């Protein structure tokens, strides 16, 4: 069995619509749209399970970013192990993206560096927010993407590409920077002033 995650679904997409879209790639074992337990409304993503990995791979390669009910869907291999998902290995953070860069454009740009497990541009109700994430299958692909793409111009904007850092890592860095900054300020203050001048 091979499982695909299908995201960015329109709320009215049904299992039957997904079956119609995904069955040409090969025999399907099951399709499940994830729904709110109380309201039964779609949460905007689903899992499509194929009998054969080769069929799932074909669907991923041919249907990613296809439009269903007016929205391009984002397909990736289902990663059920949360520790692997959150480990940060192979994850790249990209910022200062132009408004024209969507999931498909980001995928097309970064797929040159290796196999992509997932790719997403952050959006709100107004559209793309100017940053995104790419999760590569291999750490080497992520490192190559960072080396080549960091500081490059994309649609006249200089982009930042770096290793994805978890919230905990970012907080630890901020704390270290604040401690270093504060001690440096006090040290500089002490060197530049004398006690009498300070009291006046």
Swiss-Prot record:
Acidic residues bias (residue ranges): 188-200
SMART domains xref list: RRM (SM00360)
TM segment ranges: none
Keywords assigned: Repeat, RNA-binding
Segments of this protein annotated with the region Disordered: 170-200
Xref: Gene3D superfamilies: 3.30.70.330
GO CC annotation: cytoplasmic stress granule; cytosol; extracellular exosome; nucleus; ribonucleoprotein complex
Domain named RRM: residues: 2-80, 90-166
A Pfam family that the UniProt record links to this protein: RRM_1
PANTHER family associated with the record: RNA BINDING PROTEIN (PTHR24012)
Anything else known: May be not functional as it lacks the poly(A)-binding protein C-terminal (PABC) domain implicated in the mRNA stability and translation regulation.
Protein name: Polyadenylate-binding protein 1-like 2
């Amino acid at each position: 069995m091979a499982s695909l995650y299908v995201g960015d679904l329109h709320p009215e997409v049904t299992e039957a619509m997904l079956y119609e879209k995904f069955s040409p790639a090969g025999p399907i074992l099951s399709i499940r749209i994830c729904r709110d337990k109380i309201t039964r409304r779609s949460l905007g993503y689903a899992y499509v399970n194929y009998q054969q990995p080769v069929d799932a791979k074909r669907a991923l390669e041919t249907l990613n970013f296809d439009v269903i009910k007016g929205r391009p869907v984002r397909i990736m291999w289902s990663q059920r192990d949360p520790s692997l998902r959150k480990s940060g290995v192979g994850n790249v953070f990209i910022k200062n993206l132009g408004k024209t860069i969507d999931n498909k454009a980001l995928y097309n740009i970064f797929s040159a560096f290796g196999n992509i497990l997932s790719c997403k541009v952050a959006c709100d109700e107004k559209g793309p927010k100017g940053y995104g994430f790419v999760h590569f299958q291999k750490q080497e692909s992520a490192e190559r993407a960072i080396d080549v793409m960091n500081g490059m111009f994309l649609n006249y904007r200089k982009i930042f590409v770096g290793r994805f850092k978890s919230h905990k890592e970012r907080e630890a860095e901020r704390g270290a920077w604040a401690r270093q900054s504060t001690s440096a300020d006090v040290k500089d203050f002490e060197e530049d002033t004398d006690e009498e001048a300070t009291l006046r």
